[in-house]
């Protein structure tokens, strides 16, 4: 799916949490904000800064511990209006996008429109 950026977005998290499937997590508070982004949790993983992880990526074991159900990176893209992006996945109000150059990352869906 191709998108065009409609509003600038700047990441506030320079050190995004990056998880590997099966990696242990400590799940903290649920994000509550005016944006309406549902089911994001502040999580910690060994050796990393805390970061937000969407509920579908958080699994629970029989003892109540948490783990990553898939590989995941919380990297957000810095984008500007008019910029084209290729969307790979949407999750909980965000799109994982690939810019024309540079690394992929998350952008809020509210700052995107479908191209074409």
PLM-predicted stretches and their roles:
Residues 1-116:
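Src homology 3 (SH3)-mediated interaction modules
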